[in-house]
């Protein structure tokens, strides 16, 4: 039997993306998001208008989409409630966000030079996609609170072990992306780590960690 619970959150499960971009002073920003999907060589990204990443993409017109594996959940969670913006709205403060100018160090991840864009890649991520912004659209009703970005993938870097030998394809059995479902982290179909984001958003469930 179906019910109509009036769902407040519609995050049914998408891969976590670490977006690296450049701040106005040339330093790197790093932000985890899960509002992303791909079609052909393009990707659609959903970002809140109060995010430093949104400001950076509108100004610079480029970024890198870094896809972490499920084993990188610790690094992702370290920056889950951080922002590159010194000033933040009250609702973010109440959720526990803090300003962090050096996200790479906080996440304990390494900057790696890109080939075609100025923003760095995340060396530890098995998949890295250098992108340019094609368009940006207001998103979220009559008073948009977010921006939908269309980006073109200029170059994709993939760990050699993940590529099916002799082909241009990723091995789906070898690739275990970090998935976010309803603000919780999953990999291989299991909850893999407690989520700071779920705590900040007061999600009404507590899942048991089965970290590998």
Model region roles, listed by residue range:
Residues 1-212:
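Basic, polyanion-binding surface patches
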């Amino acid at each position: 039997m179906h019910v109509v619970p009036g769902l407040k959150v519609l995050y049914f499960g998408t891969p976590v993306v670490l977006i690296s971009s450049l701040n106005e002073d040339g330093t790197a920003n790093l932000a985890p998001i899960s509002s992303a999907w791909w079609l052909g060589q393009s990707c659609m990204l959903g970002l809140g208008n109060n995010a430093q990443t949104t400001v950076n993409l509108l100004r610079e017109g480029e970024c890198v989409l870094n896809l972490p594996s499920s084993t990188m959940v610790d690094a992702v969670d370290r920056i889950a409630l951080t922002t590159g913006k010194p000033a933040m709205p009250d609702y973010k403060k109440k959720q526990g966000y803090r300003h962090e100018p050096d996200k790479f160090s906080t996440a304990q991840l390494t900057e790696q030079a890109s080939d075609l864009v100025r923003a760095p890649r995340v060396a530890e991520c098995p998949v890295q996609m250098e992108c340019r912004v094609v368009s940006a659209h207001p998103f979220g009703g009559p008073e948009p609170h977010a921006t939908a970005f269309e980006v073109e993938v200029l170059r994709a870097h993939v760990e050699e072990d993940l590529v099916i030998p002799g082909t241009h394809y990723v091995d789906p059995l070898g690739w275990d992306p970090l998935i976010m479902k309803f603000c919780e982290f999953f990999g291989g179909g299991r909850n893999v780590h407690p989520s700071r984001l779920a705590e900040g958003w007061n999600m009404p469930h507590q899942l048991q960690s089965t970290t590998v």
